[in-house]
Amino acid sequence: VLCRGEVLGLTQSESRTMRKTVLALQPKNVYDMALALALIRPAAADGGRKAAYFRSGGKGKRQIITDEDAIEYISDSIGCSMDFADKYRRGFSKQIPSVMNEFLFSLKDKRGNIEQADILKELKHSPKYSYCRGHSLSYGQLVWALAYWKARDPQRFWRATTKHCHSSYR
């Protein structure tokens, strides 16, 4: 169902963007579905980043897809703890100059100019909305279960879907 792009009736997956993402990713399990859901959020997809992810097959340069990816990226970049990295992520997300400047000061001590530019380029998407891994996995499980029932018992699936879901495609 998912690999054919049959997303109609699947909560959180009915958009055209999600359909294209599912077709490109060809999810084989809940984790692939969670990745697809995270990839369509503005922070992960901005500036052709989603397309770059698909071109590289997920094996290219490190990309920030979820909030936790940003935390790990920041922690690795300046060698700080995860809680400090989360503070910096939130600072970039909310565009708090004092927190961003504190991070930049730490970054200048640890990295060269080219590395600094690459790190800041990745973090510039932080103010846009992204999923945390927990939300991505939870919704991934939901969509996976719905797709299972859509394939296994379509009549019961559609009866329940039309009764309980308020889809824009109704």
Regions found by a protein language model. Give the residues of each.
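Noncatalytic, beta-rich nucleic-acid-contacting surfaces in large DNA/RNA-processing enzymes
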Residues: V1-R170
